[in-house]
């Protein structure tokens, strides 16, 4: 038997982010897969935690929600680009959001489309309670997100 010397890896910020991002996405996929394996849907999983974020957005409103979304999507995708904006509506794209899942079509019985639908539902429910519409669609440029005051 040989003795192995272990050492703590030295990671740069990009490597740390990639590991954290993969952990986050894999946990989302596992949770959706778990729900499906038990005869439930991604909606069941999303509704479980969505009630916790409603009070925050009721307090902070449209501008805060849009800023949060731009921040999140900028962190989680290769490129985020605003296509149009006004004081009541913004449309932006996020490219290469979880390209591994998009390329493989599914991981652990969960598709890219299901993850996008889950995210749309996750943000859409609290938005509806505070007078905001939220929609997502998959395009050739990535995911297009539309947020508007009702």
Outline where the language-model segments fall:
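N-terminal accessory segment detector
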Residues: 1-117, 133-140, 149-150
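Glycine-rich GHKL/ HATPase_c ATP-binding element in histidine kinases
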Residues: 143
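Low-complexity, intrinsically disordered Gly/Pro/Thr-rich segments
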Residues: 120-136
